[in-house]
Amino acid sequence: MGQPLPHGHGSVPIGFSSEPRELTSGGNTDGVKPTLVTGATGFLGWHVANRLLARGERVRALVRDPSRVRELDGEIVVGDLRDPESLERAVAGCAVVYHVAADYRLWAKDPSELYRSNVEGTRNLLTAARDAGVERVVYTSTVGCIGMPEQGPGNEDSQVDLEQMAGAYKRSKFQAEQVALEFARAGLPVVIVNPTAPIGDHDFKPTPTGKIVVDYLKGDLPAFVDTGLNLVDVEDTAEGHLLACERGASGERYILGCENLTLQQILTLLAAISGGKAPRWRIPYAVAYAAGLASTGWANLTGLEPRAPLDAVKMARKKMFVSLDKAKRELGFNPRPVDGALKRAVDWFRANGYV
């Protein structure tokens, strides 16, 4: 099992600037090495960084565009996963790296962009971490890298076939996970976490799961397909990252999820929370597939993002139901029911002009 790492204490009330700078805090962080978080301008990375800050960590965020940083205190370093020199600067002096950043688009006109960011970017970052003597890396994979058996939920030992994986996102994340395992075998302490479908506030883009909430609230989901997700509170997912750092074993992966729910159940929960009505009509998979094919074909011609990406439809063919036993047993992961996170998501999207 991985050994616990030391944590600082106190708050860190300083905002991001366009240049790297040291943190000041009410507590004493002198001599405490910074923790690097990639993807801190995104949904999950933002929550991981905030969780660390709340525990008094010295947090350094790797960002491509400082103007996108919102409501987050810490130190900033501008860089890109595709630029090894910028990563060397980012990891310098860090004890721990949380690699949360990913290109999670379910459609891209040039799918090779996902491989450059997700696969080669991960290799670049882990190389920099190894060369800088980083003590611990938490790599954020995805539940999409967990196999879904015909019977019962998937777990960390459930294998997937790369050739049968739907889309560049899943394939690139699978290959990136293999890179992380390669570095772990070579001696870099790398723990892998596989979040399911986080939900909650500050979903800026939003993510595909957040988009379900937004589309429902806007009345753009009059019907649903017969699929299922494992939903988890994004705050619990962030806490799971910290637990993986403290207690996880290098070279192991841990599913961070909570409740296995059908899409119909999710929409029913949203109706109860928002005061709306749940859709009643189920779309046959063949109809959804045809719509995805047409939508994606038009996107490939125009360059405009498809309304229903074909890869998303393909992913929906299987219910992404998983077991949390390993994370609960080895990490002490204890997620809360997701209705509170769904309510925070609804309230945040409404308050911030998404609907």
Where are these regions (language model features)?
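N-terminal Rossmann NAD(P)H-binding glycine-rich loop of SDR-like oxidoreductase domains
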Residues: 34-55
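NAD(P)H-binding glycine-rich loop region in Rossmannoid oxidoreductase-like domains
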Residues: 67-68, 74-120, 128
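Conserved Rossmann-fold NAD(P)-dependent oxidoreductase catalytic core, especially the SDR/UDP-sugar
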Residues: 120-169
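Conserved beta-loop-beta element that borders a ligand/cofactor-binding pocket
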Residues: 141, 178-201
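Glycine-rich "substrate-gating" loop/helix at the edge of Rossmann-like oxidoreductase active sites
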Residues: 166-168, 196-205, 222-235
